[in-house]
Each structure stands twice: as structure tokens, then as C-alpha cells.
Amino acid sequence: MNRPYVFCHMMCALDGKIMGGYMGTPQGRAAGDAFYDIAFGKEPFYHHQGWLSGRVTTDDNFTFYRKPDLDEDAPVVPAGDFIAQPDFGMFYVSVDPHGKLGWESSTLRYVDTTAHVVEVLTEQVGNAYRAFLRKLGISYIIAGETELDHGLALSKLKEKIQHRDPDAGRWRRAELVVPASGDVR
């Protein structure tokens, strides 16, 4: 199977909700700190190359519902995937099948973690949005015609962002954390 090793690292309420008032309580904030430290802290439990969230979680925490600044007359971009910084080291993968996120930068910061943005799009996303991403240096992969093809997305992520481990001189296994927490501070 040509897919990255994916594991879910979630913070949720006892009723299964991933968003809610519980996150603002002292206990919720303490759990949020532990959530970050386990996955991203100075000595993380996971040694991953990126994490993945959906469009709404991305909008809630990073793009804040900004509209993309599209140029409908942008020159036609080449078909297919675009990987701007394959060796960045840490990646934030945003599943945005319809191309709606209003990014301002090709990187984002989550507490002490800086990551290169990789968008997962479908073929139906127009040239203007793809040109917008390229102009900002944001990577993207195409996974599906009109609906997201999850298997293809995972295969492409492993293929496109897997990189050599400079310490061991070997290929690192592409690993992604799939958080379901709305609290990314």
C-alpha cells in the first residue's frame, strides 16, 4: 500500500464533540496544552512530517474565513500537482476540495511549529485558484474529479512529501497526524 502512516490524535468532549465551550475551561486549556506537547512539543511522542485538517478547521484556526484574492485572468497554470517546497520538513495539509480558503502565506505557525501548506483539491477547482496558490508558493495536489478521492490523496501525499532523513541518510516514512480538535490555538 503506497500511503503514509496516518494516525488520529484528537481532543474531544465525552459526548464526542470536537468543538465547544469545554475548550475554554481551565481543564480544556490544560488538555489543549497536553494535546500540543504530545504531537508537536520539544520532545513529541509522534515523529511525523505533517498534520491534516479539513477546510472548516483550517478556516476556524488559520485563514479565518478570508476570501482568496483571485485573478480570473491569470495565465493558465500547468495541469496536475504543484509541490513548491518538498523538503520543508513539516507540512500542514488542508483538505479543500472546492478551493475556498483565503491563504496569505505558504507557511503557517501553530504555537512553536512552522509548517508549509499543502492544499488537497479536486479537478473542479479552477485555474484562478490554482494560480492564486502558486503565486503564494502554496503546494497542492489534485485528488479526484468532483469528489475527494481519499486513497489517491494519501498516495500522492506520501509520494510528493516523503523526504530523506538527514541524520540517518535513509528515506523517512511519511507520517501524518489527523487531529480532530478545533483548538489549535
Positions of predicted regions on the chain:
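Short beta-strand/loop segments at the ligand-binding rim of alpha/beta enzyme cores
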Residues: 26-29, 90-91, 113-116, 159-165
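N-terminal nucleotide/polyanion-binding subdomain common to many enzyme families
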Residues: 1-110
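Short, surface-exposed, polar/charged, turn-prone segments marking secondary-structure boundaries
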Residues: 34-41, 78-82, 120-124, 146-149, ...
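A glycine-rich beta-strand to alpha-helix segment
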Residues: 124-185
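Histidine (H) residue identity feature
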Residues: 9, 47-48, 116, 150, ...
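Short, well-ordered alpha-helix to beta-strand connector turns
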Residues: 47-49, 89, 115, 137, ...
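Hydrophobic, well-structured mid-protein blocks that either form specific transmembrane helices
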Residues: 97-139
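Short, hydrophobic beta-strand segments that form beta-sheet elements in well-ordered domains
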Residues: 51-52, 93-94, 118-123, 167-168
